[in-house]
Every structure is written in structure tokens, then in C-alpha cells.
Amino acid sequence: MVWVREHNRLAAELAKINPDWGDEQLFQSARNILVGELQHITYTEYLPLILGQNYMGNILRNDQYNSSIDATVSNAFAAAVFRFGHSMITDNVSMADSACPRQTVMSQPLESVFFKPSLVTDPEKLVMSLAGLSHEVSNKPGPNFASSVNGKLFIHRESGATVGLDLVSINIHRGRDHGLPSYNYFRPLCGMRRAEKFTDLVDVMTQNQAVQLSAVYDHVDDVDLYIAGIMESPVFGSLLGPTFSCIISDQMFRTRLGDRFFYSHASSASNFNQGW
């Protein structure tokens, strides 16, 4: 909703500068600028917080568009790795006064707002929800998940349901549905030795976590990418372990340099000026 409002704001400003433009040109031009804003925020604010400077150095090591770079989204990134944010979900939804967003007006369990679109359709509730989100503190990425998404996801209390879906299970099965290789396949790709046994995993996680995996999986080659990746200890400067940090940095490097329309490329057709 924030981006919808920003798009409309941009369109209104462009209409002032270019009164002869029609609706379609205003829409598409505002869209181009909005994409540039999203790219800028992602690469200069979000990713540095998630990955740290070492991995950002890898992403930003080149600034020229390269037509030989494949910018498509990898299966591992889409079906597993970038869903690390699911572990950052909290159990409560805060609503705050937009004039003082740090002051919570109301907090309610996340599971209680499933199937209640009034949070976004009611203008007053929408503003309060956005204000609450602006200061809500997320959980750290890791193997611990909020109870609202652990067996209570999309639970519909009004229909008498007592059990919901499990987000972790969904993530595991999504990876299998997509035919993702196991976690062990990605270790050498990210500069680590392939594990021969569960105890070899202690180079990236605690001994207790390795034991937990051995109790669930028959062989270290069976471990799902999402599960082991989210269990890895964060590397220095990053919120994530080496495997997830590696796969995300590779994806973001290719997404940027393989996109001829990326906002910062000098040759991009999306380069902006005041009238654009």
C-alpha cells in the first residue's frame, strides 16, 4: 500500500511538470521511477543490513551492465533462501498513531487478523497499521518461528477451525516440489567443504543443532536447504549464515548487472531527469 500511494504521488507530480501527458504516459513514467526507488532502497539500505559489507562488496564489485550475465531468479533463491524473512515475523500486529508511531495504540495477535481485510480496506486502520509497522521490531532470522505461523497460519477461528497451516512445513515442501538439491549440494558452491556426516556441519552451526538434524534426517545429504540454511550461525556483519548470504549475494549481483534497465546503469533507458 505504501508503494501504491507513492506511485500515485509520483504521477501527480509528473502531471504538474508535464501537463500535456496522458494517463498512460503518467502511469508508466511513475512506474519506472517507483521501480528505481525500490531498487535503490533494496541495494543501499536493505541488503547492507541483511548481508553486511563483505557480501555487499561482492554485489557491488562491478557497475556496468553485462548482457552475458543471466539475471533470472535462481530456483534456490526463490523457493527457499529468500524466505528467511518468515523467521522474522512476530506474533503481534501493532497499530499506532501516525503522528506518534512509536506509541502503540493497540496490539493484537497476528493469528487474529487472518481473513480480516479491514486492516487495509479501512483508511484509518490502514494508516495506523502502517505506522505500527514502521517501528515494529522484527525477530532475528533463525530457526525459531512465531507461533502464529507455526500451526496457526491462516487459521479461520470463525469457522470453528482449531488448527492452521505450518509455514515451515510449507517452505520445506515447496523446496521439494521445486526439485531443489539438498543443503549439502550448495556448501561447495559457497566455499565450504561438502559434509560427509552430520558432525561436519558444526563449522556453521552448533553441535546441538547438528544432532537435531541427525535425529530427523537419515543422511546429511537429505537435509533440506531451507532448514539447514536458516540454522546456520550468522557470519560476521551479516544476519544470515554463509550459505544463505552466498546465494542472496549471487542473486543480487546478477539481478543488478544483468538488467539493462537497472536504474543506476548509465546506458539504461530508465535514466531519469526532472521531467521523467
Regions found by a protein language model. Give the residues of each.
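Polyanionic, low-complexity segments and short acidic motifs
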Residues: 1-276
